[in-house]
Amino acid sequence: MMRQSSLATRLFLSATAWLVVILAITGIVLSSVYRNATERAFDRRLNLYLRTLIAEVATPDDPPDRQFQSLGEPLFELPLSGWYWQITRSDTEKPEVRASRSLWDKKLPKLEEQGIELTAAGIRIGYVEGPENQDLRMVERPVDLGADGKFLVGVAGDASEIFDETRSFDYYLGGTFAALGIVLLLTTVFQVNYGLA
């Protein structure tokens, strides 16, 4: 009887260890996949705004005091909203900067200065710290218009959207896996006891 009890304990502990390892690895992988998918969706949104800005910059015969549109996003108009765009002309003695109203009197950091390399699509993507210590997700692209100038165009959005979504997913994923783990452990106990009976 003691030998059976000892064997049952070892089988249970072994099954528990494997279960914890498998659920942990699966949880990490799923969380990473979801975070990457959330970032890609957010980046597509930023890239849409970026392309719109670049089209505005490249439009010929514009008056120098032309105001850029809000890109269809009211948050670009609200001061320190977490959504910003910035266009820097870099081929002049003193860089000329245009920015969204939301940026107020602040400036966005440059991904180029943080050592982030251009992707195959010719853009830089990364996280930066914005005004009021905001966590921002930013896309940036250098634009060379020849005689019309060289520009660095950047768009940034509030990264808390990404963090909140992934945190919520991780919370529900953890709860689901905890419930699944309990069910599997109870099943293991039943199978071990039944098999050794």
Regions found by a protein language model. Name each.
Residues A17-V21, Y172-A179:
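Hydrophobic residues within alpha-helical transmembrane segments
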Residues Q4-L23:
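N-terminal signal-anchor/signal peptide hydrophobic helix marking the start
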Residues S102-G174:
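Extracytoplasmic
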Residues D43-T59:
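Short extracytoplasmic/periplasmic juxtamembrane "stem" segments immediately C-terminal to an N-terminal membrane anchor
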Residues S14, L23-L48:
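N-terminal membrane-insertion alpha helix
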Residues A8-T9, R35, R167-Y171:
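Residues that define the loop-to-transmembrane-helix transition and helix capping
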Residues R51, A55-E56, P64-E132:
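Extracytoplasmic ligand-binding sensor domains of the Cache superfamily
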Residues G27-T38, T176, L180-A197:
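Cytosolic-side ends of inner-membrane transmembrane helices, especially those
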